[in-house]
Amino acid sequence: MLWENMCQRILPFAFNTVLWYQGESNASVDEANIYLEFLRALTSSWRREFKNENMRFIIIQLADHLDRAGYAWEKIQSEQLRAEKEIPLVNTVVCRDVCDNIDIHPKEKDVLSQRIVDLLK
């Protein structure tokens, strides 16, 4: 659905880097158990469709959150880090350390932004 509604429309255009800020609503146990394979498929298909085998992906790690603690959340966080080691041209921006655990979105977005900029240099 994301592909058809958003990405397919921009296929004629080119870009070098994708920032993947994972949505919190699809962080279930089932999704956590296939998350690394999902990232492999995502990166592979986007590189193929946009005809750019060197397309970089920067993944913004799920933030820590008290209401979301548990297996699925932590598994996705760890798979996001694992992706950096196992999928070419993938980097993960850690954000567990800039969270207050109350708001699902980290308040220190300047820190996250700087980490992204540092990866792009």
Residue ranges and their predicted role:
Residues M1-K121:
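Cell-envelope and extracellular/periplasmic
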